[in-house]
A protein has these predicted regions:
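Short hydrophobic/Thr-rich beta-strand motif most characteristic of the beta2 strand and flanking loop
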Residues: 150-157, 165
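Acidic catalytic/metal-coordinating carboxylates
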Residues: 158, 184-187
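Non-catalytic signal-transmission and effector/linker regions of two-component phosphorelay proteins
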Residues: 1-10, 106-128, 208-232
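STAS-typified acidic loop motif
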Residues: 2-36
Length: 232
């Protein structure tokens, strides 16, 4: 297959990085499968096309179809770093409004996050929490537990993305998981706290991710009930 895909989430934005060709066959099928996974939980998707060398009419039709579906849910599909040939195609077909392009991935992500920060801030139902850990599954688990208790949770597996989230909107809690790639937990805490100095800082214990789900849930809830600078 001539296409490789890499995905992650930044808060409530799902990011798909594409490298290669998006054309009829296995490539389009692979991208559609990734979009199907994304839309199960996310309505806002960023597609990074900066390293895409070809995109045929079938692929464009796929993007339009998902842009329409996501738009009906209040979200959308936005393109990051589209090559000149894609930009030209969007302008020729008058699709640039439905599939807006941004110079960089960060710009596309921020376009969604700033939209949240402005128009939807009044809809928050509880304290804000930023969760950072390299495990997407752990982030989903923590987000599910805390959201069910009334917290407004954003999570990410990327340190860079965590800083983007804090740069757009502050938080009441910073929750750092046991797995922080390339950086020590202490460095992560110091860097993120500098961006949101009033936030309560919480750290999961090193064995948190291997605990029984019930035990982990109890520890998580106890940690949030015990105040600042706690560890579960």
């Amino acid at each position: 297959m001539l296409l490789s895909l890499k995905s992650r989430f930044v808060g409530n934005v799902y990011v798909i990085e594409c490298v290669g060709r998006i054309v009829l066959g296995d490539e389009v099928k692979a991208l559609e499968a990734e979009l199907q996974v994304a839309e199960r939980e996310f309505s806002r998707i960023v597609l990074n096309l900066s390293e895409v060398s070809r995109l045929d009419s079938i692929a464009m039709g796929l993007l339009v179809r998902y842009a329409e579906r996501l738009g009906k849910r209040g979200g959308g599909l936005r393109l990051a770093g589209p090559p000149p040939f894609v930009t030209t195609l969007l302008n020729m077909t008058k699709l640039s409004t439905m599939l807006p392009g941004y110079p960089t991935e960060e710009d596309a992500i921020l376009s969604f996050l700033k939209q949240d920060s402005g128009g939807e801030a009044k809809e928050r139902s509880g304290p804000r929490v930023l969760v950072f850990d390299e495990s997407a599954d752990l982030c989903v688990f923590v987000r599910t537990v805390l959201t069910g208790r009334g917290y407004d949770v954003r999570s990410t597996c990327s340190f860079r993305d965590a800083k983007i989230l804090l740069g757009v909107d502050g938080t009441d809690y910073i929750l750092v998981g046991p797995s922080t790639p390339r950086l020590s937990a202490e460095t992560v805490v110091q860097s993120l706290t500098a961006l949101s100095p009033k936030a309560n800082v919480l750290q999961m214990a090193p064995d948190f991710k291997i605990r029984d789900a019930r035990e982990a849930t109890d520890a998580l809830l106890q940690m949030f009930g015990s105040g600042q600078d706690s560890q579960a």
